């Protein structure tokens, strides 16, 4: 059973709130870069970047991070050990905003941090998520949250984005 809990307008408002919070906490966007976790985190990061550019008049870099080789639920193999740095820009001395769609156990973000560190030492790393659903297994928290949606552990959150799914929204799946 699926139940829509956030429609496209509410999702847009959540992303706008995240955008304003990023500007406020960073006192502007100087030295800020966004890095989206594949797949939906990339599209969310691109939307935030577009709003930041509209509000601040400056384009900021947006990177795409594939964390597959860094997941702790995959066997450690040569492919994982030889993974090259993926971003087209350095994160050294930058304020990195890591962007993902859903924060659940924290394991995806841990893998993203591992993947990110090949690009130099950032000034800081903050986490922006569209949905925080709780149930953390690691000591990871989001700095920017679009919506807190408490769920039962066995439920799933499905974020849909227009670029992939043809519409925006957030659903709980039992």
UniProtKB/Swiss-Prot annotation:
Enzyme class: transferase
Domain of life: Bacteria
Record's keyword annotation contains Nucleotidyltransferase: no
Residues in coiled coil: none
Keywords: Glycosyltransferase, RNA-binding, Transcription, Transcription regulation, Transcription termination, Transferase
Reactions that this protein is recorded to catalyse: UMP + diphosphate = 5-phospho-alpha-D-ribose 1-diphosphate + uracil
Name of a matching Pfam family: Pribosyltran
MF GO annotations: RNA binding; uracil phosphoribosyltransferase activity
GO biological process assignments: DNA-templated transcription termination
The UniProt record lists the keyword Secreted: no
InterPro entries: PRibTrfase_dom, PRTase-like, PyrR, PyrR_bifunctional
Alphabetized CDD domains for the sequence: PRTases_typeI
EC number: 2.4.2.9
Binding site for substrate: 39-40, 100-108, 133
Residues in the signal sequence: none
Positions of short motif PRPP-binding: 96-108
Function: Regulates transcriptional attenuation of the pyrimidine nucleotide (pyr) operon by binding in a uridine-dependent manner to specific sites on pyr mRNA. This disrupts an antiterminator hairpin in the RNA and favors formation of a downstream transcription terminator, leading to a reduced expression of downstream genes.
Quaternary structure and partners: Homodimer and homohexamer; in equilibrium.
Family, similarity comment: Belongs to the purine/pyrimidine phosphoribosyltransferase family. PyrR subfamily.
Stated name of the protein: Bifunctional protein PyrR 2
Originating organism: Lactiplantibacillus plantarum (strain ATCC BAA-793 / NCIMB 8826 / WCFS1)
């Amino acid at each position: 059973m699926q139940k829509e809990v956030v429609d496209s307008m509410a999702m847009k408002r959540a992303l706008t709130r995240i955008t304003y919070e990023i500007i406020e906490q960073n006192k502007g966007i100087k030295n800020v870069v966004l890095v989206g976790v594949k797949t939906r985190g990339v599209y969310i990061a691109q939307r935030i970047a577009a709003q930041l550019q509209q509000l601040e008049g400056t384009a900021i870099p947006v990177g795409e991070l594939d964390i597959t080789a860094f997941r702790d639920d995959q066997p450690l193999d040569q492919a994982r050990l030889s993974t090259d740095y993926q971003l087209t820009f350095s994160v050294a001395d930058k304020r990195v905003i890591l962007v993902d769609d859903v924060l659940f156990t924290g394991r995806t973000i841990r893998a993203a941090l591992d993947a990110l560190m090949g690009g130099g030492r950032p000034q800081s790393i903050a986490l922006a998520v569209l949905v925080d659903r709780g149930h953390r297994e690691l000591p990871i928290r989001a700095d920017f949250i679009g919506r807190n949606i408490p769920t039962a552990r066995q439920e799933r959150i499905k974020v849909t984005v227009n670029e992939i799914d043809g519409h925006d929204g957030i659903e709980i799946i039992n």
